[in-house]
């Protein structure tokens, strides 16, 4: 039973795998108490595989007495969290238990589920509400050493805009490669100018660095050198986070708009889509009355045959304006994304649709559930669930920027409380920000 329930989790669900490396190491060395502790640490993060493996431990009676009620409890929790294997085990196990025991397991699973802090990982929030208009925003200078070596990368930064529209404080939240582009990014953001609104604002930006579309050979070489896919699939949160970062860089620097289809099969392959590296570029067109963005299909002449989705306009309104209109001869038999500001030129960008395996959010979410602080902080920027989880764990960086947001929203008492908690951890940025707010 041990082979079929615990070890097979690596084989049957490697694509949805939690961070089982430490726990499985303890398990294989028969340190069952430590393995149980490690699995339990992941439950608040909504880690379905940890729940499944706890069920297996109690089912097998390894390091503990066999307890089918507890086993069913954890298998039911795993099912609630999305583990597709749990249903078959639950079906077999319930046949061994009385109605009373089944009810006990159901109640215990509900209690455990109530303690899960991350139940759905989605892009839930944007910080661009009431954001001032851009006056000037120059691109960062490419560091000479990085350019000479063909190094690509990115920075994620948060910043504060003062009442006059000047950037008064900047912090690098994430970087790849480590610190390579920090100086250039900070200098660029500090030079940005926004419309004066008479009040302060908080902003967040990701700055990507590449000398044109990324080189397939260089990206592949990097992934192979660090064995990103192999270790990510094996459950390493560090490799999952890095793989997500690479996917983010590929999508951002591609000349195609990247669509993620959650319904596509998760088929492991080391071969990256050619469209990530294609030099086919977007082009311009003009369709009177259309604004916002939309996804469309075209025929052999580049004429729009269907509108798949639209944002600023409803789909019916966008269809009335777009269907039957010719985009360009280069837009034949394709799937395209259109976007335009009111009364402005229409931009047409080809679309590539890929599975979640080529999604940064997929790998960052997995890494976060598996304990990667970097990934958790990345997701906390737009997910209240991850933000609250890190606040509850007194993460200084999240305390700082959540405190800033609270103060800018007028909740001075709560904002200062959060900043003070970060300052108590000697987080210098928190002290600097408190002084200017």
Task: Locate each region found by the language model.
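Short proline/glycine- and basic residue-enriched helix-capping loop/turn segments at helix->loop/beta transitions
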Residues: 113, 117-158, 184-224, 240-251, ...
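Hydrophobic/aromatic packing residues within the alpha-helices of TPR/SEL1-like helical repeat arrays
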Residues: 39, 75, 228, 364, ...
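Short helix-capping/linker turns of helical repeat alpha-solenoids
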Residues: 19, 26-31, 44-48, 60-62, ...
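Alpha-helical linker/edge segments of TPR/alpha-solenoid repeat scaffolds
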Residues: 63, 93-122, 218, 385-386, ...
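Hydrophobic face of amphipathic alpha-helices that form TPR/SEL1-like repeat modules
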Residues: 19-26, 51-60, 91-96, 246-249, ...
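Alpha-helical tetratricopeptide repeat
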Residues: 19-27, 36, 52-56, 225, ...
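N-terminal signal peptide c-region/cleavage motif recognized by signal peptidases
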Residues: 13-15
């Amino acid at each position: 039973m041990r082979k079929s329930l615990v070890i097979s989790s690596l084989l049957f669900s490697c694509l949805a795998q939690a961070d089982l490396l430490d726990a499985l190491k303890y398990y294989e060395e028969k340190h069952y108490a430590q393995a149980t502790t490690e699995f339990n640490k992941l439950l608040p993060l909504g880690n379905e595989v940890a729940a499944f493996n706890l069920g297996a431990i109690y089912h097998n009676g390894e390091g503990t007495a066999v307890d089918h009620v507890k086993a069913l409890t954890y298998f039911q929790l795993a099912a609630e969290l999305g583990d597709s294997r749990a249903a078959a085990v639950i079906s077999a196990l319930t046949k061994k238990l009385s109605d009373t025991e089944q009810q006990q397991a159901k109640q215990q699973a509900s209690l455990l589920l109530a303690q899960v802090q991350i139940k759905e990982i989605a892009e839930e929030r944007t910080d661009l509400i009431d954001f001032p208009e851009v006056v000037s925003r120059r691109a960062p200078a490419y560091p000479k050493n990085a350019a000479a070596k063909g190094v690509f990368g990115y920075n994620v930064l948060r910043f504060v805009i003062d009442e006059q529209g000047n950037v008064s404080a900047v912090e690098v939240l994430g970087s790849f490669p480590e610190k390579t582009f920090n100086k250039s990014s900070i200098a660029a953001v500090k030079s940005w100018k926004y419309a004066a609104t008479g009040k302060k604002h908080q902003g967040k930006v990701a700055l990507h660095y590449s000398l044109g579309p990324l080189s397939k050979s260089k990206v592949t070489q990097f992934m192979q050198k660090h064995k990103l896919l192999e270790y990510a699939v094996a459950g390493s949160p560090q490799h999952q986070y890095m793989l997500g970062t690479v996917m983010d860089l590929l999508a951002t620097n591609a000349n195609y708009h990247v669509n993620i289809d959650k319904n596509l099969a998760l088929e492991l392959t080391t071969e990256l889509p050619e469209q990530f590296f294609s030099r086919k570029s977007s082009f311009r067109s003009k369709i009177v009355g259309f604004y916002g963005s939309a996804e469309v299909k075209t025929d052999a002449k580049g004429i729009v045959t269907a509108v798949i989705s639209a944002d600023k306009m409803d789909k019916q309104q966008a269809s009335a304006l777009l269907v039957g209109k010719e985009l360009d001869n280069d837009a034949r038999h394709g799937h395209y994304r259109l976007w335009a500001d009111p009364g402005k030129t229409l931009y047409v960008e080809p679309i590539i649709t890929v599975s979640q395996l080529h999604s940064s959010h997929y790998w960052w979410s997995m890494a976060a559930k598996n304990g990667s602080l970097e990934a958790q902080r990345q997701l906390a920027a737009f997910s209240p669930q991850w933000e609250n989880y890190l606040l509850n764990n007194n993460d200084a960086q999240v305390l700082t920027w959540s405190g800033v947001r609270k103060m800018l929203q007028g909740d001075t008492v709560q904002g200062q409380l959060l900043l003070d908690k970060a300052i108590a951890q000697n987080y210098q940025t928190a002290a600097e920000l408190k002084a200017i707010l």
